[in-house]
Amino acid sequence: MMLAFGNPVYDSIRTPWVWTRDRVLSGCATNAGLAYVKMGGDACVVGRVGIDRLDHYHRTLKSAGIGHHTETCRESGGFKLDYDHQGRRELEVLGQADAITQIPDSVARARVVFIGPVLQETPLDLIRAIRTRTNATMVLDPQGLLRRVGAGGRIEHFKPDGIEELCALFDVVKPNELETEILTGVDPRKDLDRAAAVLEDWGIPTVVITLAELGALIVSEGQRYRFDALPTLAVDSTGAGDTFAGGLMFALSQGLNWRAAGCLATAVASMMIEQCGPEFELTSREAQRRAARVTVSERRPAATAAT
């Protein structure tokens, strides 16, 4: 079972190809859980949602076959996302749910624990407490740890104090390119090996960096795996990294090696971005078919100074 911590959000999304009439369910932990279950695994999402969205949230998760441990709060979280033709986006806060305060007992039985916050809802003390209560593989998507609300309700990014020590608590840390640069000070599009080396030097056993149309990198035990993205039309890239994480964690739960896991994760993400919303179509058969088409290069990275 995969246990995912992170608040759901109800987003308004506008891209060059799609514009949602109503706010749609999303969120890092939610999207990862959906992908994990659609691939054939068992998942439970831990988060907080406002009374206004509670019934819809529970119905959606039940329909998808996902368990939940939900705390209610004053309002549900959500963003307004505007994408340009290059895939760049602006985030405006529509609502912010409260921080998660409860750790379900099932954390002790989980095979994988995923921390996927959207906006500061997994306090550092909560993460440390989770680590002491589980022997599961722990995976971090740091996106919500690096966001705060700035002027006019716009999201701004920052590097929090103590993030290096926190990341070292995890077995796998998966930032995207923006988050990688915030964490390391290195643009991974310009020097990918150096950016990964900085994160490795923090004591992270496996570093996964996603790079949108440039694919992804996995570095583990001194081995470097570079995955090309599959060609597709990105109708809505919201949740691409989330579902990449879901596919990766499912692959690991099945005992796949890093090469095979990265191929499957790449395939899962390629299916998500062709669609919009939590009802995205994803089957294990199609994901496996696409995974077989992923181009991978493998080598040991050259010695790279991390400073």
Predicted features by range, described:
Residues 1-3:
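Extreme N-terminal starter segment of soluble prokaryotic enzymes
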Residues 6-8, 243:
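Active-site metal-binding loops of divalent metal-dependent hydrolases
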Residues 10-23, 38-117, 121-137, 289-307:
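Conserved N-terminal subdomain of the carbohydrate kinase-like
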Residues 28-38:
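Histidine-anchored nucleotide/phosphate-binding helix
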Residues 34, 79-82, 215-218:
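Short beta-strand scaffold segments in enzyme catalytic cores
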Residues 112, 116-194:
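Conserved beta-alpha-beta core of the PfkB/ribokinase-like small-molecule kinase fold
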Residues 158-165, 190-307:
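Conserved phosphate-binding/catalytic region of the ribokinase-like
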